[in-house]
Amino acid sequence: VTEPFRDPTLPPHERVRDLLARLTTEEKIGLLHQYQRPIPRLGIASFRTGTEALHGLAWHGPATVFPQAIGLASTWDPDLVQQVGAATAAEVLVFHTKNPATVGRNVWAPVVNPLRDPRWGRNEEGYSEDPWLTGVMAVAYARGLAGPHPHRMDTAPTLKHFLAYNNETDRCTSSSHLPPRVLHEYELPAFLPALREGVAVAVMPSYNLVNGRPAHLSPLINDVLRAAAPDELMVVSDAMAPGNLVDPQHYYDDHATAYAHALRAGIDSFTQDDDRAEATLAHLRDALDRGLITEEDLDRAATHILSVRVRLGEFDPEPLRRVDPDTVNSPAHQALARTAARRSIVLLKNDGILPLRDPRRIAVIGQLADTLMEDWYSGTLPYAITARAGLAERTETVFCEGVDRIALRTNEGYLTASADGTPMTITPAPGFGPVAESAAFDLFDWGGAWALRAVVNGRYVSEDENGHLTNDQPGPNGWEVRQTFRWQPDPNGTGVLQHIATGRYVAVGDNNTVTLTPDADSAAVFAIDTLRSGATEAAAIAATAE
């Protein structure tokens, strides 16, 4: 060991102080982007924040996928959740060893937003509507992610999203009303336990405003969160949030001013423009030259960042705990995932059906019976077993989704799909005989929202970039669900379809192509022809089973 910052026998704060004193101003600024610049003259590699690990490592190839966070909390078993966190950390280490440039050890998990609104489309990411349970589970998962070593972390857990974040619509410009009592009795009790225990070492603010102020500028970052943490706390922005301070929030007129205020409010790492750090570093340099920030502001942020890197053991002679590559999706991790899944199930009612008594044939019925639901932060599944497939391993099964098969008819003809998923059209109705397969759709009624799956290719109806309806989507696969419609009936037994994501209406355009229009009066009026009753089919299937 030649430099004190590389000496693991020294306290972390002494190592950070030594390293910071060796850095130039430009090198300090280079640390403040998500993709931190290397410092070759000191032998310091680049560093990347932000590996998704909400319930297993995500987005980097097949890895163990554990139950979603809300399922983990349903186990009410902190020890089990800690084991899941430890298994996730081990797999992160394997992937990091293979590709340190793209798989960093600062993990963006757990999510600790209390689930206060059932309409929030991201509730599966959090643990509970109860802040106490959320805090308990956050401590457990973060402790597993951080690892068992008392002085060195396997990964650096990050709590998100601070603060009062339960809304996706206009999430960058909407403001959450947060009275003091709600803050202190509901929101903070979910965030503070993992910070006080020292198992979470970073926090990510949320996109929204709180009481009219962007969350990325909240005084609570320095006054409350950092006061709760026993060590230096790193604060990372959410993706593109620094730029949001100028547009669309219009809180500041220029980026240098916005970034200066964010830095002074406590943001250390700017997640902006993906791996293109140049603009962010230029804005911070501009802010320094204009006197909007000082060298001390840079030192403070760099200290928070370097403290985490020191505690990750990056500068130690042996910087990583060695993990067998076969740990990824190992039998032990598969067994742990199965245990977590089993314990996450909550039995609400049982009319003598369970436990199953070795029936010879089981009817599996329902829209989700043969579907494995994933969330945005699911990892790449090494294998998939649906309810239908799992029961089929035990005994003979018969199956149907129990959905109606329909055709949608206008005065000009039927809504028609193509096998290749090109824009849909209206085609004339046949003079006699059955409706063509291309005009048949399976109707999934989610209660106020319909999804239409084209029989001709098994793909869902959505809109393309030109505003045409197409049947080319395997299912919801983006940040927002764009494959649902609202049926608006009229007194004549017909109705119109409104695309929920855009608020526009299904209409007939040029050459009988099917488009979306903002004008309700121009919407196509449809009659529904039921080709097959899902309820009737389900009853018939059920009658053949025990």
Where are these regions (language model features)?
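Glycoside hydrolase catalytic-domain context in secreted enzymes
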Residues: 1-546
